[in-house]
């Protein structure tokens, strides 16, 4: 690889999860592409080849906000904003659109942590 691509790779390795998410959104906007479409295709291939083993090998999960207590709406909104890095308006729209996927394609540990954080403040979450 060239020195320039090596430098970019090292910079990417140092990004936090939130920064990486923001970078993906900026790349999608700048180049008119969608990371979600290609991830869905990649996930479909192992399931088709593996047959019954697909459920055991699942490594990416979607965290879905199913509902929330009306009294806890602000706390749920704050938890969603913290987890996604969205602005207030976008996070509010996401929470009010429940049931809605909050995060997609995350590891099991991250999904469980997010579920716990949102349920602690009054949201009902499922992991798919």
From Swiss-Prot:
One of its GO terms (molecular function) is structural constituent of ribosome. One of its GO terms (biological process) is translation. It comes from the Bacteria. Keywords: Ribonucleoprotein, Ribosomal protein. GO terms for cellular component: cytosolic large ribosomal subunit. Homodimer. Part of the ribosomal stalk of the 50S ribosomal subunit. Forms a multimeric L10(L12)X complex, where L10 forms an elongated spine to which 2 to 4 L12 dimers bind in a sequential fashion. Binds GTP-bound translation factors. Belongs to the bacterial ribosomal protein bL12 family. NCBIfam families: L12. Forms part of the ribosomal stalk which helps the ribosome interact with GTP-bound translation factors. Is thus essential for accurate translation. This is Large ribosomal subunit protein bL12. It comes from Synechococcus sp. (strain CC9311). The lineage of its organism: Bacteria, Bacillati, Cyanobacteriota, Cyanophyceae, Synechococcales.
